[in-house]
């Protein structure tokens, strides 16, 4: 595993590059590479190696990065989840990977989960050279997410989140320190994610650089983050993995996004909740499904 630095909008971002030791999918131009960013508030040391290392063993290079203001990357304010910035960071990571000497720049796949499961759809819609996309338990429609929050937490939950967001926005206007709220917490708390079981599920995979706090202003952005509106512009093969019991990322929105995509689409559904994707037998199952999809889409074409 190599430590890599790249820049996004002038800010230094940190990444891990894991070259495969296999020649299974190698072409004269190099190996295919999978670019991976984490979900809401996640860092590269939080659960991603459970996917990246099997990808590497299967024959794919992997590139895992921290978004600006998270983990080992630079950027201020710290812990600021901006879907626009994170999409830009994906684009910057793509350019960094395309410059790596042993990577086939024509066989790059994007992998995303939860919040980044939506990011990769948008980025692939914008960059037509992307070869494939894996979108796992994706958050594809912020409006649907707000509706779901009201369903499990009531209107009060949404009102509290907006109140914290406005407070943080006011702080930013007067150059005060950010107003932070938890990323994940128990039901009824002010955390951004507070569905039953979410706190235990998220914290079980937390890495050393992960912090359970986020700038509250992101609560004001959620409704505007709508990757579903880009879905019909996705031309490359797309794998969408949906949890039919997902309480965090609305499954109906993910299904609709898959239906709207213009290229080859595989929509796979599992009878699980959001954080069941990251461990246990279901993680093994859906990981195998991802590898099968990537084998089909990243195998070099015969001359």
Task: Identify the role of each PLM range.
Residues 43-47, 70-105, 109, 281, ...:
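Catalytic nucleophile-loop/oxyanion-hole region of alpha/beta-hydrolase
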Residues 247-253:
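Conserved alpha/beta-hydrolase "acid-adjacent" motif
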Residues 40-53, 67, 252:
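The serine-hydrolase catalytic nucleophile loop
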Residues 1-30, 83, 279-280:
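N-terminal cap/lid segment of alpha/beta-hydrolase-fold proteins
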Residues 121-204:
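Alpha/beta-hydrolase-fold enzymes
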Residues 234, 240-242, 246:
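Short beta-strand/loop motif that positions the catalytic acidic residue
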Residues 268-303:
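Catalytic active-site module of serine/aspartate enzymes centered on a nucleophile-bearing elbow/loop
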Residues 54-74:
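Conserved alpha/beta-hydrolase
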């Amino acid at each position: 595993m190599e430590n890599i630095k790249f820049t996004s909008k002038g800010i230094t971002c940190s990444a891990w590059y894991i070259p495969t030791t296999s020649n299974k999918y190698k072409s004269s131009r190099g190996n295919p590479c999978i670019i991976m960013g984490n979900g809401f508030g996640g860092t590269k040391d939080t659960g991603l190696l459970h996917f990246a290392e099997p990808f590497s063993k299967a024959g794919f290079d992997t590139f895992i990065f921290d978004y600006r203001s998270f983990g080992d990357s630079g950027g201020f304010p710290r812990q600021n989840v901006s879907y626009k910035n994170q999409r830009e960071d994906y684009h910057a990571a793509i350019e960094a990977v395309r410059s790596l000497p042993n990577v086939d720049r024509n066989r790059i796949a994007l992998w995303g989960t939860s919040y980044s499961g939506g990011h990769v759809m948008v980025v692939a819609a914008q960059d037509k050279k992307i070869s494939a996309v894996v979108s796992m338990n994706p958050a594809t429609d912020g409006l649907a997410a707000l509706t779901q929050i009201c369903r499990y937490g009531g209107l009060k939950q949404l009102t509290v989140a907006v109140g914290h967001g406005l407070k943080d926005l006011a702080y930013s206007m007067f150059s005060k320190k950010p107003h932070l709220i938890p990323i994940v917490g128990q039901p009824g708390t002010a955390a951004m994610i507070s569905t039953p079981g979410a706190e235990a599920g998220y914290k079980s995979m937390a890495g050393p650089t992960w912090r359970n706090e986020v700038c509250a202003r992101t609560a004001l952005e959620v409704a505007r983050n709508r990757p579903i509106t880009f879905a019909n512009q996705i031309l490359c093969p797309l794998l969408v993995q949906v949890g039919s019991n997902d309480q965090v990322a609305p499954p109906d929105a993910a299904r609709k996004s898959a239906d709207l995509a213009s290229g080859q689409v595989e929509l796979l559904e599992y009878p699980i909740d959001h954080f069941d994707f990251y461990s246990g037998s279901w993680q093994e199952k859906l990981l195998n499904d991802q590898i099968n999809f990537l084998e089909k889409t990243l195998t070099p074409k015969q001359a």
